[in-house]
Regions:
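Generic N-terminal amphipathic, Lys/Arg-enriched alpha-helix
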Residues: 1-17
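N-terminal glycine-rich anion-binding loops that anchor highly charged ligand groups
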Residues: 2, 21-52, 65
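Conserved, mostly hydrophobic/aromatic
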Residues: 22, 45, 75, 135, ...
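Active-site-proximal beta-alpha core segment in soluble small-molecule metabolic enzymes
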Residues: 43-179
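Active-site loop/helix belt of alpha/beta enzymes
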Residues: 139-253
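Active-site loop ensemble at the mouth of alpha/beta enzyme cores that anchors a bound cofactor
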Residues: 221-303
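C-terminal accessory subdomain/extension
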Residues: 270, 275-380
């Protein structure tokens, strides 16, 4: 493919990425965090791409956050060496962690139980290596972690230090923020996140245990935090791309969404009000993250080739390789005439879930011309 080729020439379905929107989204959050005096440790789990990583990291070596050891291995090969593996560690993963640290990667891990801590201590003793650990704190009862006032936080910290691991600090993630909407609710979630992490850090220090890192973050809370006192870093990832869920929460506008799926119209069922496209769940994913929001976007919002949304036109059903596009229930909008062979773009509900269906980004400039292809990787 030649540079500056029209997206009309692409084989569909294809994953499109507006590099100008990516730059704008990164600059927005970086400016906000600079104003709060806290650095960003970007999450690369959505990107899974070295070119995107280089755009969002402050240095070529990091820092960054990942969600799989495959990401650690791929980014380390590209020169990224300051990485937080932000999924609770399983004992079976520790040999790979040790191998990566032996190769020079400053890889830290997270845990929230004595069993995990014992496995880490055993690995440290057997390998004569200190593995850096952050204790995961639960800020909102939505996922993993210990409550900040749980005495296990201190017990785990002591076990790690006495057993030869490195207690690097605490971390938390406000999973509940994805169920909030509006500035006030998201600010409240951000403050709960900060308070939980800082309280746990204070408890560790009061027990004469080290806690240099206090790590918080999600894309919604990162944008609406007003005070990050006591926090040493913020983690966020989908802000680079944004999606319909983030738009529904009020974190971004639809015009900020940098990722879309290009699809071809392959049929009509006019009596049913259906347009058929060649992007099914293997391209869009089956994420229904907007289902409980004020506006349900189905499986994604349909746009014309320029990226302008069709009024109330959404993906309403998915099969493996077919998508059905129709007007949302109750709409009074006029059903558009989109002939077979036409190209449309779908804005995804969940950028992370959609991106993982593809092995490359078709990178667009400000004129929506394809100027590059950036490879993605997958796996665990």
């Amino acid at each position: 493919m030649t540079h500056s080729e029209s997206i009309k020439a692409l084989t569909t379905p294809a994953l499109l990425l507006s590099v100008e929107r990516v730059r704008r989204n990164i600059a927005r959050l970086q400016s906000h965090l600079n104003g709060l005096g806290v650095p960003l440790r970007p999450h690369l789990k959505t990107a899974k791409c070295t070119e995107v990583a280089r755009m969002v990291m402050t240095t070529a070596a990091g820092p960054a956050t990942v969600s799989t050891l495959r990401e650690v291995e791929q980014f380390a090969a590209a020169g990224v060496h300051d990485l937080l593996y932000a999924v609770g560690i399983g004992p079976d993963k520790l040999p790979r962690v040790l191998a990566l640290r032996k190769a020079g990667v400053d890889l830290s891990i997270i845990l929230d139980s004595l069993d995990q801590a014992r496995a880490v201590v055993s690995a440290c003793r057997d390998s004569k290596t200190r593995i850096p650990v952050l204790i995961e704190i639960d800020a909102d009862d939505q996922r993993a972690g210990l409550r900040a006032d749980d005495l296990l936080v201190i017990e785990i910290g002591r076990l790690l230090v006495q057993g030869g691991a490195e207690l690097r600090g605490v971390m938390t993630h406000s999973g509940g923020s994805y169920g909030q909407a509006g500035a006030d609710a998201l600010y409240t979630a951000a403050e709960a996140e900060r308070s939980a992490a800082v309280s746990a850090a204070t408890a560790l220090r009061s027990a004469d245990l080290p806690c240099p890192v206090v790590s918080v973050g999600s894309t919604p809370t990162a944008h609406f935090a007003r005070d990050l006192s006591g926090v040493t870093e913020v983690r966020a990832g989908v802000f680079v791309f944004f999606d319909m869920v983030m738009a529904g929460l009020g974190v971004c506008e639809i015009d900020d969404i940098a990722m879309s799926v290009l699809a071809t119209v392959i049929g009509h069922q006019s009596a049913k009000g259906w347009i058929l496209i060649d992007a099914g769940w293997t391209a869009l994913s089956q994420d229904r993250g907007t289902a409980h929001q004020a506006v349900d976007q189905g499986y994604g919002l349909a746009c014309d080739l320029s990226g302008a949304p069709y009024p109330d036109l959404i993906v309403t059903r998915l099969n493996q390789e077919h998508g059905i596009v129709s007007l949302r229930s109750g709409s009074t909008a006029r059903f558009p005439n989109i002939p077979i062979g036409s190209r449309i773009r779908i804005l995804p509900n969940h950028a992370c879930a959609t991106a993982t269906q593809f092995d490359r980004y078709h990178v667009l400039n400000e004129k929506d011309q394809v100027t590059d292809i950036w490879q993605r990787f997958s796996g665990w």
